[in-house]
Amino acid sequence: MNWNAILPEAILAIGILTVFILELFLERKHYKFLSVLAFIFVVLSGYSIFFVNYPAKLFFDGFSVDALNLIGKLFILAVTGFVLLSSYDYFSKKNSQYGELPYLYLIATLGLMVMISSDNLAIIFTGLELASITMYILVGLFRREYLSKEGAFKYLVIGTTGTSMYALGSALVYASSGSMVLSPVKEENTLFALGVILIISALALKVSAVPFHFWTPDAYEGAPTPTTAYLSTVPKIGMYFLFVKLTMYLFSAFPDWKYVVMLLAVLSMFYGNIVAYAQKSVKRLLAYSSIAHAGYFLTALTAVDKHLFSALLFYVFVYALATVGAFTVLAILEKKEGWTHHFLDFKGLKEENPVLASMLALFLFALIGIPPAAVFLGKLGIFFGLVKTDMFALGILFAIASLISAGYYLKVIVYMFLYSGEVRHGQTTVSAGEAFTVLGTAFLVIFFGLFPHVVLDFILRALS
């Protein structure tokens, strides 16, 4: 057995045990040390990916390692690293230095890495649940705050609903095909079709697509802001890599699946963007933005095309970078006395914190899809991919939804730069980790916009 193939997961598992054991003996004041240690293990795990021998299959062909899922793991670890660095000062200022937090992020990340390497529906379920259960805990960490408890409960309910649908869908696929291992299916029947629809629905719920989005904004709003950054990015990367794999295997035998995905995509794009205009909280606005982006991403799954898939995976990654950057700025601002993320708090922010206002504006422009931000190329790639695969009408709807979204992002920027603040919140401290995350994500969003081939070429080769 090629044990080298699971080197990234093994390093992360060692990191979890190390941080867990140290947390038992160290006082809360060493929380920063545990966060940095967890970050080091994330870096080591990411570095080890370059030494993995692939392709490889392990555990009775239920776990595979290939170029595509190694890229997915690298993306997941990169974004997790940024979240870890940005979180320790935030929780210190909130007097919530939970020693469990660093290894909870690692456990969720390990589950997602196992999930995208799985070629067996049962192992996918195991990885998915390892990540999901950990994320329920992360949402409810501010247990003294009502919104955090409410968000955790709601996230638990919607998460277990998705789990139930996935389990039943997998059982139906197994009943119709006689195997839990993913392989090209040539024939469909009623049981298989129903199983595929349930699996699509379960994963759509996990990525917060309409109509499975209910309570997602509440969970995002109630969670600690660095946790919201994690929830809205890292699991999405894992889910869309899994979606691509399932599209190439299971869904190819069910030709009508694309209409199900198309419906979910259109509903998510327009609902998320329209309802975002009614929000008074910028944090909640970004939650609805993530629902709209789920719709954008799902449009790329309506056809089996490597160029569409490569644009999707590139888009998901750069969207994650921009979103983590935006939420990190919100986390920094939240440390101010009386800050609530209400639009009124952002009035005249350029006068109090010109650098933070400028960085947040950059991330919001990136999410709109304005060049040279890399998100623009992701959107452009999906649009041309839809046109190329004769999905012209869907491509037009995709473009219209993107234009609609510009308004609410620009509203935040207008409040920051064109209005004068009525309430002064004063300056705030920025930790080294937060500064590195904001500057690092901003640099990568622009860098990949100018040099997209650095990532796209690897994804295209992996898909080929």
UniProtKB/Swiss-Prot annotation:
Enzyme class: translocase
GO biological process: ATP synthesis coupled electron transport
EC number: 7.1.1.-
One Pfam family, short name: Proton_antipo_M
GO cellular component terms, A-Z: plasma membrane
UniProt membrane topology term: Multi-pass membrane protein
Compartment(s) of residence: Cell inner membrane
Disulfide bonds: none
UniProtKB keywords: Cell inner membrane, Cell membrane, Membrane, NAD, Quinone, Translocase, Transmembrane, Transmembrane helix, Transport, Ubiquinone
GO molecular function, one term: NADH dehydrogenase (ubiquinone) activity
Catalytic activity: a quinone + NADH + 5 H(+)(in) = a quinol + NAD(+) + 4 H(+)(out)
Transmembrane regions: 6-26, 33-53, 65-85, 98-118, 122-142, 155-175, 192-212, 237-257, 259-279, 285-305, 312-332, 356-376, 401-421, 436-456
Taxonomic superkingdom: Bacteria
Keyword Translocase: yes
Protein purpose: NDH-1 shuttles electrons from NADH, via FMN and iron-sulfur (Fe-S) centers, to quinones in the respiratory chain. The immediate electron acceptor for the enzyme in this species is believed to be ubiquinone. Couples the redox reaction to proton translocation (for every two electrons transferred, four hydrogen ions are translocated across the cytoplasmic membrane), and thus conserves the redox energy in a proton gradient.
Family from the record: Belongs to the complex I subunit 2 family.
PANTHER family, per database record: NADH DEHYDROGENASE
Quaternary structure (record): NDH-1 is composed of 14 different subunits. Subunits NuoA, H, J, K, L, M, N constitute the membrane sector of the complex.
Protein's UniProt name: NADH-quinone oxidoreductase subunit N 1
